[in-house]
Amino acid sequence: MTNPPQAGSSRRTALKRIAATAAAAATAPLIGTVDPARAADAAAQQIGAAAWETLIDGNSFASRAALESEWNYLYPWGSDHNGTARMYASSTDNNHCYLSPAGVLNLKATRITWNEGNSSKDPYLPIHYHSAAVHAKNQVLVSDRYPNWEIRGEFQAPSARGTWPAFWITGANSWPPESDILEYKGDNRNWFNTYDGAWENTLVAVSSPGSWHEYRIWMTKTSGTDVQIHYYLDGAWKGAHTGSNFVGKTMNIIINLQMEGASGSSGPAGDTYYKARNVYVGRTNNG
């Protein structure tokens, strides 16, 4: 894993280290014909003298106060989405969104036994679960000023049929864009997805999704309209997608535990847990 610049580190060295990750990934299929070190130098020069800044430092789940300073409860648009879980969480309702131990966010889905109607969002499925979601107060915007972004976190994700955890970014004012950093849909395959009007998918079988794994993207501006997104699992590069027309589009960062829907019906009768820690967001700032 490439670490972000730390206090007291050389800005040039730190930026070169970050850039090397994307450069090495971009040249991975060409190893033997392209010098990765030279490619890393070129990528570092493209980043240039930009300053690296941290938006979420990895400690936002250390306490309830820290959580609420960096995250909002529910989806950006409310409690419902495209599955059968309705999100319930607030500063006074911690049944489905809580910290235990300190530093670990727990989202819990519980099956309900009463009729709560249907989701207000397409495809309007009947509500079978209460669960939780959070979205970051900081938003993602790729631009000339902010051309490079790193988003990562460690997760213990459920993967049983009917469970649908996600860690993703999506358009705040329009859809697309979307990038799914973590998404399990009822089995042990993580879906690294990019949506820009058409879907690009990289599916990776994960050994024990319920154990801690790190999921990460490096997103960089490649033109006046497009980005390239590199996807990583546990520090290993898994693929690169093009996000057309991502530039200039404000995006929300979301962690949620949805249920059923695309992950299959007849979900778990018992409680389902999705855990997160060390979530980090940083970017270059050209001033």
Regions found by a protein language model. Name each.
Residues 17, 41-149, 181-186, 257, ...:
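Low-complexity, Ser/Thr/Pro/Gly-rich disordered linker/stalk regions
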Residues 61, 212-221, 229-231:
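Short tryptophan-centered beta-strand motifs in secreted/extracellular beta-sheet-rich domains
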Residues 167-192:
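Glycan-recognition/cleft segments
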Residues 70-73, 225-275, 284:
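Aromatic sugar-binding interfaces of carbohydrate-active proteins
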Residues 161-169, 226-227:
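Beta-strand acidic-aromatic groove motif in beta-rich domains, primarily in extracellular
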